[in-house]
Amino acid sequence: MAAKKQPRTKAAGKKAPPQRHQKQKAVARRPTPARKPSASRGPSTVHRKPSVAVRVKPYDVGPLTDWPAYDGPPLGAHVSTAGGVAEAPARADLIGATAMQIFTKTPNQWREPAITADEAAAFKAALANSGVRFTNSHDSYLINLASPDSAIRARSIDSFTRELERCHALGLDALCSHPGNFIDDRASGIARNADAITECLEARPGPTRLLMELTAGQGTVIGSTFEEMAELIERIPAALRRRVGVCLDTAHVYAAGYDLVGDYDGVWERFDAVLGLPRLGLIHLNDSKAPFGSRKDRHELIGVGTIG
């Protein structure tokens, strides 16, 4: 989330003091609380069909005593796990979230820490004492299950399998994953991606559902069209396919050419016809910095970008 360019003072020609990020209209305004440590964050996250979600920094929020009544599908955001995964549910409560996405590890490193029994127990206890009703993880940004490079693909399979282990240990509802980059040939990449997912799901059975995230279509990435995502999922054996669903990121699909502004109902009708609404497990609500059909993955705060 990029900070706004700061104005220069005319008198001294120096930059004005940094300003806080503007909160989105959906957030009730309140006094700014004491600053808390920052940590990793991701896109707004909601389970199934939300009405609105908000991207916020952990240190920008405090308890919301005036949070409006909400009884819809689980709705929330990506929250920090700084200090341990057991800290995340309380942070979700600070913003009134009933859905929560986390990283179970640092997403831009190959290091694969296991979740200990004590960590899992503490997380589950904290979750039970929170208002969160849906939890999911987002996997590592380094994973490429479609890679033609055997070493990268093997390392990706190992990392993805360990991510499933951590999700199962924590009892998470879902794991959100980006399809890989085919690099050489699209059809071969889709086949490699599906085979790798199959291998991982067979190796780690459990309750966590895998949600494949639709992409913006940049470079050689797989999964920017409903048809391509359907092909990927259909290549997974039927016995395992029931554990696989879809995550729709609004910024991604808009950049990929699905007109959420001019043909909102039509986009969902197409999704249902090709993938089926029962496969929809998660929506990432993001605005887009990039224009419609640009095939660029550039997130923006809701209401600020090209979706509006």
Label each PLM-derived region with a short phrase.
Residues A2-D139, I143, S147-E165:
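N-terminal pre-domain/capping segments
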Residues D71-P73, S130-V132, G206-P207, L240-R243, ...:
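A short helix-to-beta-strand connector/capping loop
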Residues L94, N129, A169, V274-L277:
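Alpha-helix termination/capping residues and helix-transition junctions
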Residues A117-S137, A194-P207, L232-P237, T306-G308:
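Alpha-helix-loop-beta-strand connector modules within alpha/beta enzyme cores
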Residues A187, I222-F226, A230, Y254-G308:
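Gly/Pro-rich active-site loop or hairpin
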